[in-house]
Amino acid sequence: MQTITVNDAVGQALAEEMRRDPRVLTFGEGVATNRRDLLAEFGAQRVRNTPLAEGIIAGAAAGAAAMGLRPVIDLLYAPFLTLAMDAIMNSAGKLRYLSGGQFEFPMVVLARTGAGWTVGGQHNHNLEAMFVHAPGLKVVMPHSTADYKGLLKSAIRDPNPVLFFMDMTVGHTPGPVPEGEHVVPLGQAAVPRAGRDVTLVSYSKSVTTCLAAADQLAQRGIDAEVIDLRTLKPLDEATILRSVRKTGRLIVVHEAAAPCGVGAEVAAIVGEKAFASLKAPIRRVTGPDAPAPSSWMLEQAALPQADGIARAALELVGAETVPA
């Protein structure tokens, strides 16, 4: 086991896949500058910078993928994915179906999201639910350092376009990663903490918040199970349903706003397939339906907090107060 940062885990995944498959290449905003080791090893034909032109970058990637390459593009900040929607949704997402399977689009789109850098609404907007709704796309949002590497390797090998959202605050966060080949299948959730009283479902950085809430709940004798979705599309319904049938209570947590979000989809699945197991109404703890603030204090206030999650869980099990 090695201890490396998230940025290094992503770099390892890219390097290993580029060595394994000569069709893999990477380009985008600052790629050759930020990945000088890849540029030195693989050259400018496979590692290159681009202008700040998200639509052109995504369009070039879709064309390269259709012609048999496996591009990994970096568009930096998630809000600017809106400038690449046509290439990602209408070309890469649909043309495999529209061509009767004659074309595949094995491309990965890297984008950073999440609060913590006080970059304001221009650079911080959680758009994952929008892409979950688009046919033909897969959507990944890792939490652990090991999953950043393992899920990226799976995304690169997948024959479909994959949106790979990275939390912008965790790049220098160290964590354990297995040595050598480490691949995590898409569509499989993780259960970093087992429990019997309430299920906390989350993804990306909010998993850490859920684990902190579970620690608070343990002080009150409440045993919370935490599920890290890892992949938002395809969604691991089986793991969610198995947990809810055991605990009878569900709270979904994410930084994105509540309306039509991932939490709403998880709640709908449980309502349709495990309603009889529920002992209490499903709860969502989310960010507000508002642009991201630039103030650090306001940004922190807008994030789901462990206290709020614990309080919601206590209400579901019939307790009244959260520990000080």
Q: How does the language model describe each region?
A:
Residues 1-161, 165-166, ...:
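Thiamine diphosphate
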